[in-house]
Structures are given as C-alpha cells and as structure tokens.
Amino acid sequence: MPTMSRPALDVKGGTTSGKEDANQEMNSLAYSNLGVKDRKAVTVLHYPGVTANGAKANGVPTSSSGSTSPIGSPTATPSSKPPSFNLHPTPHLMASMQLQKLNSQYQGAAATAAAALTGAGLPGEEEPMQNWVTAPLVVGGSPGSVSPPAGAQSPALIDSDPVDEEVLMSLVVELGLDRANELPELWLGQNEFDFTADFPSGC
C-alpha cells in the first residue's frame, strides 16, 4: 500500500512543505555543530530573501506572540523597494569591482592625456575633459598660500607613488632587461624600423 506524505507540523503550529523540511534537515546535517542562532545566520546567508524568523523579506513578518507590529513601524506594510544586495560580496565580485574601478581610472587618464596632447581644439568646440587640477587649493586656510595636490605632476600618470629605484633595478635584472643589447629577441623587427637611431648608445 503506497504511503502518502503529510506536511510536517512547524514548531509554531503551522505547516511547512516537504521541500522546506528537506532544506532544514539538510542544513542541520551540513551545519550540525552550529547553534540555533548560527543556523539562522547560515539560512539568512544562503537564502537572502528570508528573514531570521522565517518570514519573507518583502512580506509582513510574523511575530512569535501573534500580535501585529505597531502602526508607525516601517515593516507594517509590504515594502515596494527591491531587496538590498548582500553586504558581504563574494571574492569574484570584489575582484570584478576592483578591476572595473582600475579600468575606469585608466580610461579617464588616457582620455585626459589625449585631450592634453591634442590641445584646446577648435574655438567653438567644448573641451572634452577638464584638466586634473581645475582650481588651486588653499592650504592652511590662508587665501595667499596656494599649492597643487601631490599627485598633479602629469595628467598621464595613473599612480603618482614614487618608484623605489632598487625595486625597479631588481625587476630589470630579473627580467634580463639589463642585457638587452645581448638578446636578439628583444630587437626583432629592427630591419623594418630604425630603433637604434632612437636610443642612445649607452642603453
């Protein structure tokens, strides 16, 4: 005789579906060494649409005492806002955001350098991008003392940190660039272009 599955009774007297029961059982097996609070935190992390008490994030939360929330409470009515994003993004997302930030900085610096090289353009034409320093900065509060920011040496520079010469020389030695005249593979194409005329003989 086939057995029929019944919905399991919830602790609060309600019923849960078999799928939710299986998820709870799986979480309890996977995180058996965690306390009740920790399991709720894991559930919230795994299912961001569910609050700690099991209610949907965009619905009316259930209360353990059965009373409704106060009238002035922002959770009394269903929220029409989209759910907020996770406060702890994944490492892939962090890396992507960092690359995007660096790429936008690089594109901005390249556009500024191109605008500086082409000059002001035609008289009726708007300037595509302003220079890095648009107005002098006042240092110390006195209107007479004016100094540019530390990183405003050149608009083509992305990072204005000084490079340590020892580190740079160790990279040159490590990459073998100090033996550039001895390595013919670094001079490929010299028949097509006259590179030797461009560089001083001491290099």
Curated annotation (Swiss-Prot):
First-listed, main subcellular location of the protein, grouped into a coarse class: nucleus
Location in or out of the cell: Nucleus; Cytoplasm
PTM summary: Phosphorylated. Phosphorylation changes in a cell cycle-dependent manner and reduces its transcriptional cofactor activity.
Residue stretches of biased makeup (Low complexity): 61-84
Motif range (Nuclear export signal): 168-177
Gene Ontology annotations of biological process type: apoptotic process; brain development; labyrinthine layer development; melanin biosynthetic process; melanocyte differentiation; negative regulation of DNA-templated transcription; negative regulation of neuron apoptotic process; negative regulation of osteoblast differentiation
Induction (UniProt): Up-regulated by parathyroid hormone, forskolin and phorbol ester in osteoblasts.
Keyword Nucleus on entry: yes
Disordered: annotated span: 1-24, 51-86
Pfam families in the cross-refs: CITED (PF04487)
Chain segments annotated as transmembrane: none
Tissues where this protein is expressed: Expressed in calvarial osteoblasts. Expressed in nulliparous mammary epithelial cells; absent in pregnant mice and in lacting mammary glands. Also expressed in mammary tumors (at protein level). Expressed only in melanocytes and testis. Expressed at high levels in the strongly pigmented melanoma cells but at low levels in the weakly pigmented cells.
One GO MF term attached to the UniProt entry: LBD domain binding
Disrupted-gene phenotype: Mice die shortly after birth. Mice show an abnormal placental development; the spongiotrophoblast layer is irregular in shape and enlarged while the labyrinthine layer is reduced in size, the blood spaces within the labyrinthine are disrupted. Produces more mineralized bone nodules and deposited twice as much calcium in the matrix.
Keywords: Activator, Apoptosis, Cytoplasm, Developmental protein, Differentiation, Nucleus, Phosphoprotein, Transcription, Transcription regulation
Assembly, per entry: Homodimer. Binds to RBM14. Interacts (via N-terminus) with HSPA8; the interaction suppresses the association of CITED1 with p300/CBP and SMAD-mediated transcription transactivation. Interacts (via C-terminus) with TOX3 (via HGM box); the interaction increases estrogen-response element (ERE)-dependent transcription and protection against cell death. Interacts with ESR1; the interaction occurs in a estrogen-dependent manner. Interacts (unphosphorylated form preferentially and via C-terminus) with EP300. Interacts (via C-terminus) with CREBBP. Interacts with EGR2.
Functional note: Transcriptional coactivator of the p300/CBP-mediated transcription complex. Enhances SMAD-mediated transcription by strengthening the functional link between the DNA-binding SMAD transcription factors and the p300/CBP transcription coactivator complex. Stimulates estrogen-dependent transactivation activity mediated by estrogen receptors signaling; stabilizes the interaction of estrogen receptor ESR1 and histone acetyltransferase EP300. Positively regulates TGF-beta signaling through its association with the SMAD/p300/CBP-mediated transcriptional coactivator complex.
Family from the record: Belongs to the CITED family.
Record-given protein name: Cbp/p300-interacting transactivator 1
Organism: Mus musculus
